[in-house]
Amino acid sequence: MTNKDARTPASSQTGEALASPQGDQEAGKSIGWHKAYVAGSRPDLRVPVRQVHLTNGESVTLYDTSGPYTDPSVDTDVRRGLAPLRENWIIARGDTEEYAGRPVRPEDDGIKHTSPRGGLRNLDAVFPGRPRQPRRGRDGQAVTQLAYARRGEITPEMEFVAVRENVSAEVVREEIAAGRAVMPVNVNHPEIEPMIIGKRFLVKVNANIGNSAVTSSIEEEVEKMTWATRWGADTVMDLSTGRNIHTTREWVLRNSPVPIGTVPLYQALEKVDGRAEELTWEIYKDTVIEQAEQGVDYMTVHAGVRLPYVPLTANRKTGIVSRGGSIMAAWCLAHHKESFLYENFEELCEILAAYDVTYSLGDGLRPGSIADANDEAQFAELRTLGELNRIAKRFNVQTMIEGPGHVPMHKIKENIDLQQEICDEAPFYTLGPLTTDVAPAYDHITSGIGAAMIAWWGTAMLCYVTPKEHLGLPNRDDVKTGVITYKIAAHAADLAKGHPGAQEWDDALSDARFEFRWEDQFNLALDPDTAREFHDETLPAEPAKTAHFCSMCGPKFCSMKISQDIRREHGGTRTEVEEGMAQKSKEFAAAGNRVYLPLAD
């Protein structure tokens, strides 16, 4: 894990400044960037930021999701895991207890009792970090940030995200208490750097990782997680469906500085050899507890896929495209019974409240093609999600709502408007949406368009789409492309919404561009490495980093250089400009106020 891999230029190119351990750091003013920390009200509350030092002596502070991996003063080791940042905060509240937990079974990793344990691949399989017992609320208490917020308490986690978001801690508490924002922070994931999801805050981006029966290993998934967070992923979902699901998840959680989400239904299905009709509430419940004990911060639950809604998909062009949705539809039809997730939802609420696991209520009937957008099945499920959201709130469980999908541009706004109305403004978490179906290999672009639009109108978190969508499992480069694409969409929405400080980043880069400060442009970019690479393809020499032109227009046709020349030759102070205008007015009057003057002989 080197700094060269970070969401920042390599240190050898920028003269990277090391971060000091003090709050609100200004350590190391060399040009480039360094990891810094803004101090809170207590010694153990230090909020990470990326500070970019510019060649003009100014600096820009940016939101940072990369965790300790980009702090050269921290010795990270994936076999040891990250330091438990929140552990003392959790213990100090006095409302949780450690307990033995459920035993880890072979089937948790998709292995039969008769199978050898040797199916685990890479990283020596079982996580070797410090032994830990799971923690849960005492005596059935809800130990959720929602419960605290409703009691008027401002937790250290709330203060942490307030500093990150450049808002007051009271705003954070109010939004969580109202159900308009969630903070996924399982008590068993103390390594997390708290973040918040809600329409009053910065638009967040989720990256998906996960193995499958066809490809990938534990080591690859851990590396994908750290890679995604370095490029700006605010949360990561582990959607593993192959072997080693439990073990992969343990490695990911112990090394993740961001919230980790899952779809418990996938692992439950593995436990019954992929036969949906053999699923039971007991198997699903056990899987949820297993994942909650490990520290999963939010879970997608497809409780809105009900038996009466399945026939509504019969005339669709692409039917049910959600994996979780199709599993639950198959179960409902096999038993001709109501969904066990819907019928046992209140018991599920009690479980999640004991660990502070956030609901991500799944859109199992989302449209999988433009033709199916905004149909009866989609909105029937949405109405049920609104009902379930209100039940979850009774149990003090934080809740967000998942959304589509494939939606043409003219139908996007209806989705966010209905969701906000039906679900009492609970945070909306959408997959894109994809605005056209004609671009396999470019669906990060088709969906990025929809993502920017729906985030502008109020979606709180965007689930990224990579170039491999509909084609295969994304690799490392695909993950980076997906994250960068969606960070662009999210930031564009932050600008449109007028989020505090959002435009400062753009203004800093615009100034650097106009003043031909190439290194500053690279260092301020979402993807500094690619920006530098593209520039150097045509102007690789070091003096080109100070040239007042690039290879697109050359020195004679650069519009910004011409603009600078005009300012230099004809510009001046505002007073000088106004005096010049007044003089021209007098000359016009002296000429008889004539618009057209006679031609000279």
From Swiss-Prot:
Per the record, the pathway is: Cofactor biosynthesis; thiamine diphosphate biosynthesis
Q: What Pfam families is this protein classified in?
A: ThiC-associated, ThiC_Rad_SAM
Protein keywords: 4Fe-4S, Iron, Iron-sulfur, Lyase, Metal-binding, S-adenosyl-L-methionine, Thiamine biosynthesis, Zinc
Protein residues bound to [4Fe-4S] cluster: 550, 553, 558
- What is the free-text note on the cofactor? Binds 1 [4Fe-4S] cluster per subunit. The cluster is coordinated with 3 cysteines and an exchangeable S-adenosyl-L-methionine.
Q: Which reaction does it catalyse?
A: 5-amino-1-(5-phospho-beta-D-ribosyl)imidazole + S-adenosyl-L-methionine = 4-amino-2-methyl-5-(phosphooxymethyl)pyrimidine + CO + 5'-deoxyadenosine + formate + L-methionine + 3 H(+)
Positions of the UniProt region annotated as Disordered: 1-31, 100-141
Question: What's one GO-annotated cellular component?
Answer: cytosol
A single MF term (Gene Ontology): carbon-carbon lyase activity
The entry's substrate-binding residues are: 208, 237, 266, 302, 322-324, 363-366, 402, 429
Family named by the database record: Belongs to the ThiC family.
What name does UniProt use for this protein? Phosphomethylpyrimidine synthase
Q: Which organism is it from?
A: Streptomyces avermitilis (strain ATCC 31267 / DSM 46492 / JCM 5070 / NBRC 14893 / NCIMB 12804 / NRRL 8165 / MA-4680)
Source gene? thiC
